[in-house]
């Protein structure tokens, strides 16, 4: 059971890193297309991430 939780946590972590890298690349491409304009976006990712991790460790 513990190894399953570790595996799930590892997959979540790697998915988060992958998603972050894709978002950065997409933002760079959009900035290039818009002539250097930068859009401000409010990101609310940490709240759901913390609740998911808490539910994972409650078990």
UniProtKB/Swiss-Prot annotation:
Compartment annotation: Secreted
Entry-linked InterPro entries: Frog_antimicrobial_propeptide
Keywords from the named record: Amphibian defense peptide, Antibiotic, Antimicrobial, Cleavage on pair of basic residues, Secreted, Signal
Residues of the signal peptide: 1-22
Free-text tissue specificity from the UniProt record: Expressed by the skin glands.
Keyword Lyase in record: no
Purpose: Antimicrobial peptide.
Protein name (record): Temporin-CDYd
